[in-house]
Amino acid sequence: FKTAQIYEYETDPNNLIPTIDKFSRYKKNGDGTYTAKNKLANRCWKLQHANVITWDGLVVPCCFDKDATHQLGNLKMQSFKEIWHNENYKHFRTELMKSRKNIDICANCSEGVSVWKD
């Protein structure tokens, strides 16, 4: 199964979060807000193995960067090998290993976490 990623999950203004806890990556807090159900480790398999190349040649970390806000490089200007070793990529890797939860696309990601808890 894949769980739905909700952009505004803290308040869920469109009521998109599943009501059955088992099928949600979010948990409801006592004050009515939501948080991610699981703790994020400061590592990511996708960053190393599942980059995304957008229609216009931009390289982004993964499929969670739907709006290409974390551009690591542009294949029209560099080879993938050059992008893999450039400063943007190195900086993103470093930030992820320091605090994955502080990167917007990573804070709302289910990679490496167990969502399906009974």
Report each predicted region and the residues it spans.
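Short metal-coordination and nucleic-acid-contact micro-motifs, chiefly zinc-binding Cys/His arrays
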Residues: 102
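Short cysteine-rich clusters marking metal-coordination/redox-active sites
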Residues: 106
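Radical SAM enzyme [4Fe-4S]-AdoMet core and its adjacent flexible, acidic
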Residues: 1-83, 87-98, 111-118
